[in-house]
Structure formats: C-alpha cells, structure tokens
Amino acid sequence: MTVFAAEQQFHDAERPLPSHQARLACRAGLAETTAGVAPGFVQGNLAILPEKYAAAFHRFCQLNPKPCPIVGMSDVGNPMIPSLGIDLDIRTDLPRYRVWRDGELVEEPTDIVAHWRDDLVAFVIGCSFSFEEALLADDIPIRHIEEKVRVPMYRTNIPCAPAGPFSGPMVVSMRPLKPKDAIRAIQITSRFPSVHGAPVHIGLPQSIGIADIAKPDYGDPVPIGPDELPVFWACGVTPQAVIAAAKVPFAITHAPGLMLVTDLKNKHLAVL
C-alpha cells in the first residue's frame, strides 16, 4: 500500500484529523514519503539529542533560521509534544528514523521505542512540504509529488553559522520550475519564514557546490525540463548533516522525506 492510498483509507476512518490519521498510519508501520499527505497540516524534520548537546543545538538553530526553523521541542526525556498534536509520540509517529552513533548511521528503524532514553530532547524543525501546499494552490507544479518520490536534497558550499560542536554546510531541497513559476514561488514562499521561506539560490547548481544535479545526496532525482530552472530552498536535513559531522556519541533523526505530520495548520504559518 502506498502512503497516498493509506492516507485515503484513514480519511475514511472515524478519526478527528487527517494529520492524526497519518501519524496512526506511521505507528502501524507505514514507511513511505509524506509528501502530499494530510494537506493543510505542518510537517516537520526531526533531530533528537542527549540533553548535554541540546543547548548548543538550539543555539545552532537560532543562528541558522533558514535551514533550521524550530516549530516544536520536547521536555527532557518526554517523547510526547502536545503542542504539536493529539497523542503525538515522537518515538512511533514518523515513517522511518535514522540512528547515529559517533557520526555514523547505524540503523534506520520504523520506531525508536527501544532507543529512547530519559536524557533525550527532541527538536521538530519546519519543513518545505508546508509551503508546497501554497505553491500547489497557485497552480505551481511540484515535480516530486507528481513523480511520487522524495524531494531531491543536496549538500552545498553555503556555510552555516557554527554553535558549539555543530557546524557545516547548508543542505538544500530542489524543485524544477519554469521561470514565471519561479518568480511566483519566491513571492509565495517568502510568506513562510518558519518553514524555510524564500529560495536561497536559483539556477547554476555548480556555484553552490552541487557537482551533479542528477545525483542528490538525499532523496530521489527528478527530471528537469529544458525550459525549467532548478530552484533551491534551505532544507531541514541540514541539522542531520551537522549532527553527523559533529560526531556526537548518539543522535536520532528522521529519514529524509519521511516527516512528522503535526496538527498545526500551514495557513497559520503565513506572515502576510
């Protein structure tokens, strides 16, 4: 069953919110991309760290609001974040996780119950899937949704401001757009600073350190038409890259493209 079919199935069930239904699907073992799931609701990237590193990571996010806009944070040792959703359990409610030890990816489980500890702090970081709803509403096509794959993401040569052990380059997501749509996309996404805001770069991927746009570092490649430009947004996978580079003894993140679906409304994130 695809995530799109599963979402429709849960829409038909007697559940209070599509976002809650999506989390229940993940809790039941569904492990697919969440792009296009629960339209209207905010999705988030995930970073979980021991309390020892939480303050420095929080500072890193404050210094780098484009790639790392925090939309929610747990109390120490508490896997529930009530401000983000009904019955939301950070240990079970994402499709897939990544477990890191000393900067190395060691496991990609569908839940982290066995890995949870009393000293962990969870950060939920804004995701570009939220502004995609606004783009679609303006008839701007989103290629990875059309192709039913994960958005392509790339490490760049754009530096992030360091904080404590956390430093490194920005990761960006890419959507191919025709020039007229790219201009409109800048206008639309500028209204959503808490989910990455306006693009950080348009065209010429080599100038931001992307050697081969057909080979993303995360996610899946998508076709780019001859009349289209690659448009790049700051991406919430950036924390994943800097956590790995910092080689902290233990950390957990989401698997790229497989996000936490919250009960927050996208429309409430717009600033204009």
UniProtKB/Swiss-Prot annotation:
GO molecular function, one term: lyase activity
Keywords assigned by UniProt, alphabetized: Lyase
Keyword Lyase among UniProt keywords: yes
Species of provenance: Rhodopseudomonas palustris (strain ATCC BAA-98 / CGA009)
Classification via SUPFAM superfamilies: PSTPO5379-like
Protein name in UniProt: Putative hydro-lyase RPA1747
InterPro entries: D-Glu_cyclase, Putative_hydro-lyase, UPF0317
Family statement: Belongs to the D-glutamate cyclase family.
Species lineage: Bacteria, Pseudomonadati, Pseudomonadota, Alphaproteobacteria, Hyphomicrobiales
EC number: 4.2.1.-
Highest taxon above the source species: Bacteria
The keyword Iron-sulfur appears for this protein: no
